[in-house]
């Protein structure tokens, strides 16, 4: 199987061919996802909640992410694999380089960091050292204590303008991709159209270049409250493989997210 690269995703954006991505944490699910057609995966710090049982992602370490990155890479050797940089693992550009190197050695193709224009020095330093970066704006789970909870971001004009400014700054610093989480659909559309790099949405409407879901949400096995922007694809299909194929199809056809999964 030909490995998926960032060049493939840039081409999809140019051709307006939407793509589905998902979180993965082990070799078995990574292999299953790859066999159904998922070719971009994220080893997310969401594992702190989905696997470790915590209320936030803040307890996750670089060693945790590296361990699961190695497992996912073993199961999906051809996928484009993103790895989250955990809380405080990129507080300085130098620290970001040290920790990103560990994740790249574990099998990641790029690292994802949460934050706006303040991250530009780190993004620039990593890019110059051959570490591709995916930015993350909007709702940033590592900032839950600043936000006061998990809330939609960018609903007023000033906040929306700041998101666009941060997105352009990250792209200018060398970011190769961007995740937008829990922002109004029109804001996400504006940002996606303004950037040359692929934009992946989660709770950001259907006009981003790609979509991502936490696998536990997509399969309806998350405990507690299910966010309004997710869909349980397993409920209708009754089979994990069929559910993943439905997720891919619905994203590619623009059927997911639907209006009920979108913020205005």
UniProtKB/Swiss-Prot annotation:
Cytoplasm found in the keyword field: yes
Pathway: Cofactor biosynthesis; (R)-pantothenate biosynthesis; (R)-pantoate from 3-methyl-2-oxobutanoate: step 1/2
Record-annotated active site: 181
Amino acids binding Mg(2+): 45, 84, 114
Keywords from the named record: Cytoplasm, Magnesium, Metal-binding, Pantothenate biosynthesis, Transferase
Catalytic activity: 3-methyl-2-oxobutanoate + (6R)-5,10-methylene-5,6,7,8-tetrahydrofolate + H2O = 2-dehydropantoate + (6S)-5,6,7,8-tetrahydrofolate
Location in or out of the cell: Cytoplasm
Annotated Gene Ontology cellular component terms: cytoplasm
Main location: cytoplasm
Cofactor binding, note field: Binds 1 Mg(2+) ion per subunit.
Pfam families (UniProt xref): Pantoate_transf
Organism domain of life: Bacteria
InterPro entries from the UniProt entry: Pantoate_hydroxy_MeTrfase, Pyrv/PenolPyrv_kinase-like_dom, Pyrv_kinase-like_dom_sf
Cofactors named for this entry: Mg(2+)
Family statement: Belongs to the PanB family.
Job description of the protein: Catalyzes the reversible reaction in which hydroxymethyl group from 5,10-methylenetetrahydrofolate is transferred onto alpha-ketoisovalerate to form ketopantoate.
PANTHER family: 3-METHYL-2-OXOBUTANOATE HYDROXYMETHYLTRANSFERASE
Name listed for the protein in its UniProt record: 3-methyl-2-oxobutanoate hydroxymethyltransferase
Species, as recorded: Edwardsiella ictaluri (strain 93-146)
Gene that produces this protein: panB
């Amino acid at each position: 199987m030909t490995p998926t690269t960032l060049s493939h995703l840039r081409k999809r954006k140019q051709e307006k061919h939407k793509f589905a991505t998902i979180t993965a944490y082990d070799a078995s699910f990574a292999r299953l996802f790859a066999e159904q057609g998922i070719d971009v995966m994220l080893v997310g710090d969401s594992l702190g909640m989905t696997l470790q049982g915590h209320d936030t992602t803040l307890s996750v370490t670089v060693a945790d992410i590296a361990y699961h990155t190695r497992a996912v890479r073993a199961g999906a050797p051809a996928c484009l694999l993103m790895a989250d940089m955990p809380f405080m693992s990129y507080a300085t550009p130098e620290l970001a380089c040290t920790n990103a190197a560990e994740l790249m050695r574990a099998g990641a193709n790029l690292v994802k960091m949460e934050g706006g224009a303040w991250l530009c020095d780190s993004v620039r330093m990593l890019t110059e050292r051959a570490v591709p970066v995916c930015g993350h704006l909007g709702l940033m789970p590592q900032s839950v204590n600043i936000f006061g909870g998990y809330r939609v971001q960018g609903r007023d004009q000033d906040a929306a303008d700041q998101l666009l400014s941060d997105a352009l700054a990250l792209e200018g610093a060398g970011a190769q991709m961007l995740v937008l989480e829990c922002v109004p659909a029109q804001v996400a559309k504006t940002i996606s159209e303004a950037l040359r790099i692929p934009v992946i949405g989660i709770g950001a409407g259907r006009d981003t270049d790609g979509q991502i879901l936490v696998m536990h949400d997509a399969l309806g096995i998350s405990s507690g409250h299910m966010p309004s922007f997710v869909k349980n694809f397993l409920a209708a299909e009754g089979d994990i493989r069929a559910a993943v194929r439905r997720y891919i199809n619905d994203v590619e056809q623009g059927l997911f997210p639907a209006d009920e999964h979108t913020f205005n």
